[in-house]
Structure formats: structure tokens, C-alpha cells
Amino acid sequence: MNQNLSIRKRNKLKQDSGSPEAQISFLTLRVLQISSHLKMHTKDYSSKRGLRKVLGTRKRLLSYLCREDVSRYNKLLNNLGIRAAKK
């Protein structure tokens, strides 16, 4: 439910779920959920591995978006409140 609301807020079209912006915003929500879970369950190694996988996927999508359109990349970083990836 939160995922759909987040995607709709960040995208122009309601049915847009395949754009890099939509995917990155979905993955950012996922990162926040897993991070809050790990604060309570520090020894949950499966979740730590899942967090690393999600972060890697988000990093690849961010680098793709940076290559393709820097203005969209910068706007997305400001909207989501995340740092730029190291180059």
C-alpha cells in the first residue's frame, strides 16, 4: 500500500512502475523497512544480506539514471533525500 502511494507521488503517470525513478523509490522504501527491522533484530543475517542486495540494485539503477539523464538523477536524489553514489 505504501509502495503504491510512494510511486504515485513521485511519478507523473499512475501506471508507471517501470521507470528508473519508480524502481528507485520502491527500493528506497524497501531499504527503510529492512533497516528499521534490523534495528530491532541485529543478528538477523538473512535480512542483512537482503539489505545488501537491495542496496546494490538501487546503486546500479542510480548509476544508470545518472548516465542517461543527470537532471532527473539530481531531482530524484533531492526528492528521496539520499546521497549521490560514488563515481
Curated annotation (Swiss-Prot):
Gene Ontology cellular-component annotations: chloroplast; ribonucleoprotein complex; ribosome
Any one GO biological process: translation
Alphabetized Gene3D superfamilies for the sequence: S15/NS1, RNA-binding (1.10.287.10)
Recorded superkingdom: Eukaryota
Subcellular location: Plastid, Chloroplast
Pfam families, per database record: Ribosomal_S15
Principal localisation: plastid
Gene Ontology terms, MF aspect: structural constituent of ribosome
Chain spans, region Disordered: 1-20
Keywords noted in UniProt: Chloroplast, Plastid, Ribonucleoprotein, Ribosomal protein
SUPFAM superfamilies for the chain: S15/NS1 RNA-binding domain
CDD domains: S15_NS1_EPRS_RNA-bind
Presence of keyword Chloroplast: yes
Family: Belongs to the universal ribosomal protein uS15 family.
Subunit structure: Part of the 30S ribosomal subunit.
UniProt name for this protein: Small ribosomal subunit protein uS15c
Gene for this chain: rps15
